Amino acid sequence: RQPKQSRTGYVNSESSRHFFVDDLEHPYNDDVNKFNWIRGYHVGGRSLTWGRHTYRLTDLDFEANLKDGIAIDWPIRYKDISPWYDYVDQFIGVQGRNEGISHFPDRKFLLKPFGLNILENHMRDSFSKNFSDGRILSNARTAHVTEGTKPGLGRVSCQLRNRCMRGCQYGAYFSSNSSTLPVAEATGNMTLMPNSIVHEIIYDEDTKKAKGVRVIDSENNKSYEYFAKVIFLCSSAIASTSILMQSKSNRFPNGLGNDSGELGHNLMDHHFQVGASGRFDGFKNKTTYGRRPAGYYIPRFRNIGGKTNQKDFIRGYGYQGAASRGFMGIANSKEEMVSYGPRLKEIIVQPNEWTAGHGAFGEILPYHDNKMELDYDKKDKWGLPTVTFNATIRENERAMRKDMRQQAAEMLERSGFKDIYDWEDKYVFGNGIHEMGTARMGHDPKTSVLNKFNQVHSVKNVYVTDGACMTSSGCQNPSITYMALTARAANHAVDELNKQNI
C-alpha cells in the first residue's frame, strides 16, 4: 500500500515502514511530471526519520538570488538568523568539527565529533594536496548527542548502533518526541491533539486576523474548531501550503495570504542521486569501531568566488559520504561458499576491503512554474482536495549534475582509489525529500507570501516556518534552518503579543 512512498528506496524496511503514509489513503497527483512526496503523519513527523545532517545557510545563499537576478531577494541575511542557529545547536545537540570556512561557518556549541576513520583522514589529506580550490573533507555535522545530555526525555550519548531509522530509544539523535515535546509538556501549557487533520485556518473578516483552525479527526471523521491568538504552520512545505490554499474567504478567495498569487509556486527540492564509489588497497591492518550514524561531508566548492566560478551553471552542491570496511558476510568469497563449521565462522567475521562513496546534494533554482495545486475533483477519504504537482529540473541543474558526477569520481581517483564507479540516476522531483519554497519569504507583499519574520504579509498572526517559507534552496540539508527560523519567529510572536500588535 505504499507504491509511491517506496519509490526512493528510503521506505523499504519493515522496521520503519510504519513511519510513512498509506498511499491509498493519502493520494496525490503527479501525472504530468512524476513527484515523490515522501511523508508520514504521526506524532513526531519527519523528526523521527530525517537524515539529521545540519548545515547552515550563509550569505553566499541569502544573497544569491539578488546577485544572480533570480526570483526575489531573501528578506534576511546570516546575521539575522545566526543567533537562532546557535540557540538551536545548543538545544538539540550537534556533533562535528569547525573548519574556519565562511560558507561552512564555525559553530559555538558543536559536540565532539564521531571522528573520521583512517581512510577518511587519508582522503582529507589528499584533498588538501591535490586540489587548490579550497575543497575539504570534514566530519558530517549531525544532530546526535556525543557527550553529556540535552533537554528532553533523558537524552544520552549515541550508542553507535546506526539504527536511527527505527527511532532512537536513547534520544541520542534529536527528535521532537525525545526533546521538544517533553520540554513543552513540562511547561503545563501544551495540549497535544494527535489524529487531527488541519485543513483550514479560520479568518475573521472583522478583525482581519486568523482566529483558529478547523480540523477533521481521522479516527471518527468529525470536524472540530480550535481557537488561538497566534497560529504557526510548520507541517512541512506541501501540507502547510495546502492548508493555506484551502483557507478561503471573501477576503482571500484564492487562499489565505495569497494576494501575490505566489502561493504554491517556486517549488524546490535538492537534486541528488549522483556520485561515485571505489575500492582502496591499503590500511589492511586497520578497521573501524562501532557503527557511526554519520560519515563525512564535503562542503560546497563551486561558485564561491574566483577560479571556483563555473561558466556552465550557477550555485553549487556538497557531498555526503562514508568510508568503511564491512565484514565479509555470507558468500562474499569462493572460500566461504565451500567452507563450513569453524572455518566458515572464521571467514565471515574477517573485515572486507576498504571502500568509500559519496553522493551530492545540489541546489535547484526557484522557477515560478514549478508548482503545486489543489484538485477538488479528486478528494481523499476525508473529502479533502488532493495535491497535484508539476515540477522539473532545468538546464542549470542538468549542467550541475554532470559536474557533480565528474568531481565525485575525480576526488576518489586522486585519493588513490581503484575500481571507481560513478553514477547518475534520473532525478525525480521530491527524491531529496527536501521540498520547499511554496509560500516564500520576501520584502514585497506583491511578490511573496511571508515577511522577514515568517508572518503572512496580510494576516500578521499567522506564521509559516517550515520549508514553504524558503526563497531559495541552497544545497544544505534544510531542517536546521527551519528550526532556527521557527525559534526566531516564536520569539517575535511573543514580542508582538506583548505589544498587542497581533
Mark where each language-model region is.
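A glycine-rich dinucleotide-binding beta-alpha-beta segment and adjacent secondary-structure elements
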Residues: 6-7, 16-17, 21-24, 33, ...
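FAD cofactor-binding and catalytic pocket of flavoenzymes
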Residues: 21-39, 43-46, 50-51, 56, ...
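Short, solvent-exposed loop/turn and secondary-structure capping segments
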Residues: 51-52, 61, 65, 149-151, ...
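Alpha-helix N-cap/helix-initiation motif
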Residues: 70, 173, 221-224, 229, ...
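A non-catalytic, amphipathic alpha-helix used as a structural packing/dimerization or gating element
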Residues: 76-87, 262, 403-407, 488
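A conserved FAD-binding loop/helix module that cradles the flavin
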Residues: 472-493
